[in-house]
Amino acid sequence: MTRKGRRLVLIGAGLGVLALAAGLILSALNDTIVFFRSPTEVAQQQVAPGARLRLGGLVETGSVVKSGTLTTFKVTDGNATVKVAYSGILPDLFREGQGVVAEGALQPDGSFKADSVLAKHDEKYMPREVADALKKQGRWQEGGPAPGTAAPVQRAPGS
């Protein structure tokens, strides 16, 4: 084999190894590449209880209930809804009808226990498919409801 031929074989083998390494890395990071999953994706993919993930969608109107530091609410994408329980201080932008991303684990009963909650201020953080589905159903609110116009938060008895 000539010197030029050996060089081509060496370069080809190096590129093959790099492609294989990139494929293995992407395969290992598959679940963390997606910023969040919608309630419909969680229902369709049959996510195992205890699996850590990020759940994103809109806070369903009339679903927020506060009891001390525990807040329960429902996240919807218009097709499916997941009940979320969060213990902690909610972000200032959190309100009904507004976009939210909750990070935590799915529970055996199908609810979601969030460790952290991020309020989204616009559609930039929502997948185009979710935004389009909400617009088609007439549930999309550009920028969310104006301050003071959201439905009042329900208080649990005795809180």
Swiss-Prot record:
Parts of the chain that traverse the membrane: 8-28
Residue ranges, Cytoplasmic compartment?
1-7
User: Where would you find this protein in the cell?
Assistant: Cell inner membrane
Coiled-coil intervals, chain numbering:
none
Q: What is its main location?
A: membrane
Key words of the record: Cell inner membrane, Cell membrane, Cytochrome c-type biogenesis, Heme, Iron, Membrane, Metal-binding, Signal-anchor, Transmembrane, Transmembrane helix
Establish whether keyword Cell inner membrane is in the entry: yes
Q: Name one GO biological process term.
A: cytochrome complex assembly
GO terms assigned for molecular function: heme binding; metal ion binding
Give me the residues that bind heme, please: H121, Y125
Task: Tell me the residue ranges located in the Periplasmic compartment per UniProt.
Answer: 29-159
The region called Disordered is annotated at 134-159
Query: Where does it sit, as one GO cellular component term?
Result: plasma membrane
Its membrane topology is listed as: Single-pass type II membrane protein
Q: Does the keyword Iron apply?
A: yes
Pfam (any one): CcmE
Q: Which residues form each disulfide bond in the chain?
A: none
Q: What exactly does this protein do?
A: Heme chaperone required for the biogenesis of c-type cytochromes. Transiently binds heme delivered by CcmC and transfers the heme to apo-cytochromes in a process facilitated by CcmF and CcmH.
> What family is this?
Belongs to the CcmE/CycJ family.
Q: What is this protein called?
A: Cytochrome c-type biogenesis protein CcmE
Q: Which gene encodes it?
A: ccmE
